[in-house]
Amino acid sequence: MTQMTDAKSGIITEEMKFVANEEGMDVETLKNLIAKGYVVIPKNVNRNTKPVGIGDNLRTKVNVNLGTSPDFVDIACELKKVEISNKYGADAIMDLSTGGNLPEIRKEIIKNTNLPIGTVPIYEVGVDAKQKYGRVIDMDEDLIFNVIERQAKEGVDFMTLHCGITKQTVNALNNDPRKMGVVSRGGAFLTAYIMYHDRENPLYKEFDYLLELLKEHDVTLSLGDGMRPGCLQDNTDRAQIQELITLGELVDKCREQGVQVMVEGPGHVPYNNIEANMKIQKTVCKNAPFYVLGPIVTDLAPGYDHITAAIGGTLAAVSGANFLCYVTPAEHVRLMKEDDVKEGLIASKIAAQAADVAKGHSIAWKLEKEMADARIKHDWDRQFEIALDSDKPRKMREEIPSKDEKACSVCGDYCALLMVEELGKR
């Protein structure tokens, strides 16, 4: 049984009750959204995961990517990133490790959080294939599905799988060449496999078998966008749209089998094209939850891509995206460090909150009202409690204090609020 099959059968699960309470919504309404495939609750039956709802009519959620690389392996560092994710309000974590003992790293990450955990299994497949055969492109079907099954048994809650990379998609790429080609790592693994062997993508060819594996453990399938644009010039091209059409067809198959599914979206999109991209996805994929990376709205800001992504993420979420994958200041430059994780997470949470306010979500507006009330009362402790990051503003206030405890050091005796407040008391 999955959350979706239960919902279709009219069963309200404990996870549905928890999410409905968190979202401030009627549980029957939530159940119906899950039954239709408009909402997912990524929760592997083998793990005691905190239930998190992703999809329409819910708050916008934020994911944190972390993980090792071939150039830097430090489990303690990754666990610190997990700690930061837990502390500053991430809704999910993805382990994208490609260096070191991948199963051991994943085990430690899972052990140190109750947030939903996602992976990209093709990374481990590629690493194993290179170690075993000498090349990533020599991976075989058995290796692919063995890794997926093993990760499902370990408790992974959602998996990014690039099932929409097909021979037809690769042809679309070849017939309409891009500036940046394929920038998705998992997408590149499978594109290279198809081009070298002239074989169909096993994840597409054996999609029914894949669904059996995922359904057994109620792993949510996150359909990866292997043809996402890697620069603004490549946005919304034929390869991207061809893959999206395929993903829409696969969403139908998932729903027929009762497998929870969401769809991943583009990374580099000009601001004026974001709304159209969201509407195309929601139409083609029939309102499946949409999970976007950014989108990044300019390629000119390495070192500041948490900002470019937050700008794009706000509009994306207002226009239909349900799940924002954070982007850190280190994007396009190096592996993220602990401070990068915090900066990226807070930036993405700002985008999510701004979008939820624009969409009129009651919880988002409740928080805004509480902040205004705290500011009117000059209640600095309460302001910092409500803030998305309480530590930074508290430290900043301590660095240059005001003589007046109610004011801040920008205005001091000339505080606008205090001046009018004093006059009102006369």
Curated annotation (Swiss-Prot):
One Pfam entry name: ThiC_Rad_SAM
Cofactor: [4Fe-4S] cluster
Residues binding substrate: 65, 94, 123, 162, 184-186, 225-228, 264, 291
Molecular-function GO terms, alphabetical: 4 iron, 4 sulfur cluster binding; carbon-carbon lyase activity; zinc ion binding
Residues that hold Zn(2+) according to the record: 268, 332
Recorded metabolic or biological pathway in which this protein acts: Cofactor biosynthesis; thiamine diphosphate biosynthesis
Cofactor stoichiometry and binding remark: Binds 1 [4Fe-4S] cluster per subunit. The cluster is coordinated with 3 cysteines and an exchangeable S-adenosyl-L-methionine.
Residues that, per the record, bind [4Fe-4S] cluster: 408, 411, 415
Alphabetical list of HAMAP family matching this protein: ThiC
Described purpose of this protein according to its UniProt entry: Catalyzes the synthesis of the hydroxymethylpyrimidine phosphate (HMP-P) moiety of thiamine from aminoimidazole ribotide (AIR) in a radical S-adenosyl-L-methionine (SAM)-dependent reaction.
NCBIfam families assigned: PRK13352.1, thiC
The protein's name: Phosphomethylpyrimidine synthase
Source species of the chain: Methanococcus maripaludis (strain C7 / ATCC BAA-1331)
